[in-house]
Every structure is written in structure tokens, then in C-alpha cells.
Curated annotation (Swiss-Prot):
Gene: phnX
Protein name: Phosphonoacetaldehyde hydrolase
Entries under InterPro entries matching the protein: HAD-like_hydrolase_sf, HAD-like_sf, HAD-SF_hydro_IA, HAD_2, HAD_sf, PGP-like_dom2, Phosphonoacetald_hydro
Subunit structure of this chain's protein: Homodimer.
Catalyzed reactions per annotation: phosphonoacetaldehyde + H2O = acetaldehyde + phosphate + H(+)
Organism expressing this protein natively: Bacillus cereus (strain B4264)
Length: 264
């Protein structure tokens, strides 16, 4: 079996180490309404279309209870749309600062292209948001062959439609000749639902939720424990393989090709 294409996520996978751009914005829009949410709660739905992310936060039992305590009722669709519009406005203003490619990504992409591998991408950001991210990422040397956003298909993650559209545009089939790489639970589900080899990247991921400085300064035993927690979470949600850094991806690819593995 030959791998012909790799589909990458963006924030937390190829750019924005730790996926911090949306995090504080989610926390801020709830705080403004007197409802405090934790960073862990804000990260849990990461990878979804952002309005779906806001909706998922309002459906978490603790947050829903706190909202009801403050407002006397559960959040409505009008509340969700109002918060999303506010989220988007703030995010647009900060996105240019969160499009830096993660160390090693550009080199891995170049190596894959030397092998004739096509590079696709999916995201939880809207097309309008991605226009900002792509523009900045290109200036810094990262540009996949194709991008699909949730705006381009009937539904975003965990549905497989963004991966299918990548496959059509890149001209690659069957789906098990492609690898999906991401940093969230919804990425793992997207890849598996699409019938692709699915790989979770840990360092720099939203699931790990650490800055580069925190990773470098953390006690090695504590860091290893956190890495293993994320690794297990990825596997439990469908990852065929996990890698700590993007530099390990080609080893995974060679393993799949040499062993003639079959997706199960």
C-alpha cells in the first residue's frame, strides 16, 4: 500500500503551538456574562466548527447549571449566536498572531512533497477566519495544496466530509491511501469516520494545552505523564498511531507501507 496524501489540521497541529488563539476568547465571552469556564472545559470541544464549539460548551452540565443560576434559564440558540458573533469578532483581531508554523512542520511537508505526497488540510475555523491564517502562514513558508473548511461542506467534524472533499480535489482514492493528522479528539473521529489512517500529534496539541516554554521547563516525569494521558485519549477516540512531534510522521508512514497494514 502506498500513502498518497496527508490531510493536516491547522491550529495545534501545523500552526499555533498549543492552539491558544481560540482558548481565551471562549473564556472571555462567557466571563462577560458572569459565567466562568475553565481552560480545560474551553478546550474539550476544540476542533469543531466554532459555533458548534460554543453550543457544546453551553451543553456541558456544569456550565449549563451555572448559566441557569445566573440567568434563571438555560442558554437559548439566540444566546449561542450572540456569543459566537462576539467570539468571531475578537478572534479575527488576533488570528494574525497565531499562524506561525510549529517547529519542524515545514521541513516535514517539504520531505513529503519530495516523495510525491499531496498535502491537504481541514479545520474548525470558518473560511473567513482561514483567509487570515493562510495569508500569514504562507508568508512564513507553510502552504498545503488544498484547504477545506466547514463552510465548504454540509457539516464539519466529526463528520468526514472535509476529508472526502480533500480526496476529490487532490485526486486520491481509496481513503486508506491517505493519512489524517490532528491534535484533538474531533480530528481522530473525523479521520476514522473518513476511513483514513488517523494520527494524533501530542506536543503542541490542544489536548496537551501547553506552551513551548511550559514543555521545556516542566519536570520530565510530569511531562511524560501528561503526554501519556493525551496519547491514551487519542487512541480511545480512534487514533491508529500517535506521535509526539511531526518529525515522527514519516516513520509511521513507512510502517504502514512496509507492513501492508489494513485499517480496522
Amino acid at each position: 500500500m502506498k500513502i498518497e496524501a496527508v490531510i493536516f489540521d491547522w491550529a495545534g497541529t501545523t500552526v499555533d503551538y498549543g492552539c491558544f488563539a481560540p482558548l481565551e476568547v471562549f473564556m472571555k465571552i462567557f466571563h462577560k456574562r458572569g459565567v466562568e469556564i475553565t481552560a480545560e472545559e474551553a478546550r474539550k470541544p476544540m476542533g469543531l466548527l466554532k459555533i458548534d464549539h460554543v453550543r457544546a460548551l453551553t451543553e456541558m452540565p456544569r456550565i449549563a447549571d451555572e448559566w441557569k443560576r445566573v440567568f434563571g434559564q438555560l442558554p437559548t440558540e439566540a444566546d449561542i449566536h450572540e456569543m459566537y458573533e462576539e467570539f468571531a469578532e475578537i478572534l479575527f483581531s488576533i488570528l494574525p498572531s497565531y499562524a506561525t508554523p510549529i517547529d519542524g512542520v515545514k521541513e516535514v511537508i517539504a520531505s513529503l512533497r519530495e516523495r510525491g505526497i499531496k498535502i491537504g488540510s481541514t479545520t474548525g475555523y470558518t473560511r473567513e477566519m482561514m483567509e487570515i491564517v493562510v495569508k500569514e502562514a504562507v508568508l512564513q513558508g507553510y502552504k498545503p495544496d488544498f484547504l477545506v473548511t466547514p463552510d465548504d461542506v454540509p457539516a464539519g467534524r466529526p463528520y468526514p466530509w472535509m476529508c472526502y472533499k480533500n480526496a476529490m480535489e487532490l485526486g486520491v482514492y481509496p481513503m486508506n491511501h491517505m493519512i489524517k493528522v490532528g491534535d484533538t479528539v474531533s480530528d481522530m473521529k473525523e479521520g476514522r469516520n473518513a476511513g483514513m489512517w488517523t494520527v494524533g500529534v501530542i506536543l503542541g496539541s490542544s489536548e496537551l494545552g501547553l506552551t513551548e516554554e511550559e514543555v521545556e521547563s516542566m519536570d520530565s516525569v510530569e511531562l511524560r505523564e501528561k503526554i501519556e494521558i493525551v496519547r491514551n485519549r487519542f487512541v480511545e477516540n480512534g487514533a491508529h498511531f500517535t506521535i509526539e512531534t511531526m518529525q515522527e510522521l514519516e516513520n509511521v508512514m513507512e510502517h504502514i507501507e512496509k507492513q501492508e497494514l489494513i485499517i480496522s
